[in-house]
Amino acid sequence: MSQMFLLIFSIMLGGCASYSVTEQEMTDYLHDNVSFNQSVGVENLMYAQVSVTDLAVKIGRSDADRVAVFANTVANVQLFDSPKQRLDLDLEFSAVPHYDAKTGEVFLQSIRLEQFTENGTPLPADIKRLIKPAVSMIGYGLSQKPVYKLDSHVLQEALIKSAEPNLVIRDNKLVIELFD
């Protein structure tokens, strides 16, 4: 009887030795749980409001140990008496993922703004200077909110969460594993 228990336990443990999070799962988590709207400046003088409209995550593609977050954003910009301008911005952030064992959450650290364009074209310097603080706040927000969280109600995720796992990037997935 005890041998049967050990066999079943080892099969379960072997199946739970790691948990992978795909790019799509992380993208879906961000869409469902995180929203970004930032504004800077003084309205009717120099003002910008930036809202993220779409996010996509790429894991370990451009840099083996980093996660890239692509954000399509809309920026409404007003400079002095000129009419408001609407800009469709493409942002790319990259960051190192970090797993918090206490909460079962994945956070992004060492965030870098890699790309900052409007439809693939660099922005004029005056507009870039005005919008950059709001864009930086989006990057800051990405570092403060989890980009993925293990679900305590799913057995495999609960078992991984209760241990002290490592986080690695493998095959364009975040892999939370119990053993090196």
Residue ranges and their predicted role:
Residues 4-14:
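Bacterial N-terminal signal peptides
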Residues 16-180:
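Extracellular/lumenal and peripheral-membrane lipid-interaction modules
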